[in-house]
């Protein structure tokens, strides 16, 4: 049976890429597309929004009215909207691919609670390459982490509203966990003025916002006399969209639980 997917935030940059990815993938189809209430895009054809021509699927604003048209929601929007979508999924037995970043601790707790009743993949980044980088960072941290200064540099387009990026924070979490550190204690998110000497246990973050940068992340493991850099650069949002569709196919066989792309890609067995 073909898996039917719904895209929320269908008119956004990521939403349009997701529509394209769904249409190009095998075994799935676009069941519904949504925008926020009052959007000028309500009633527009989802295919035309994505540059694919008419698909006969009109952008809607009420998930409940369209709930019989899809099995899984893909959500790359903003925390306040995503929390409402999570409630909908729990109440209506729908599964969720969640790519929204910028959740506070309460939001993350709500996601975990919802996963006790439905199946959710929650990842800061759906790129296969980035998730491979997470594993490489763990390996590098084991070898060099206690003897080097660790810095994470990320760059994104001017429209991104949260900083550091969710991916950069995930990188920091993977490193901190490997080293037995707490990112809330050891993370350094800004430097200005007289900061004093750097602590060896610091995990530093630097953020760039400029033009149309899709997403770039570089992690330094810097020791005296040498530096190892692990980088990932995305040139198209399609890498994230294709990963999200891949995650949706994988999630179709799950009933409840909170998963990430490590589970989807079976990276724990590397």
UniProtKB/Swiss-Prot annotation:
CDD domains: DHDPR_N. NADP(+) binds at residue 36. GO terms for molecular function: 4-hydroxy-tetrahydrodipicolinate reductase; NAD binding; NADP binding; oxidoreductase activity, acting on CH or CH2 groups, NAD or NADP as acceptor. It catalyses: (S)-2,3,4,5-tetrahydrodipicolinate + NAD(+) + H2O = (2S,4S)-4-hydroxy-2,3,4,5-tetrahydrodipicolinate + NADH + H(+); (S)-2,3,4,5-tetrahydrodipicolinate + NADP(+) + H2O = (2S,4S)-4-hydroxy-2,3,4,5-tetrahydrodipicolinate + NADPH + H(+). Pathway: Amino-acid biosynthesis; L-lysine biosynthesis via DAP pathway; (S)-tetrahydrodipicolinate from L-aspartate: step 4/4. Its EC number is 1.17.1.8. GO terms for cellular component: cytosol. The active site is at residues 156, 160. One of its GO terms (biological process) is diaminopimelate biosynthetic process. It is found in: Cytoplasm. InterPro entries: DapB_C, DapB_N, DapB_N_CS, DHDPR_bac, NAD(P)-bd_dom_sf. HAMAP family: DapB. NCBIfam families: dapB. Catalyzes the conversion of 4-hydroxy-tetrahydrodipicolinate (HTPA) to tetrahydrodipicolinate. Belongs to the DapB family. This is 4-hydroxy-tetrahydrodipicolinate reductase. The lineage of its organism: Bacteria, Pseudomonadati, Pseudomonadota, Gammaproteobacteria, Pasteurellales.
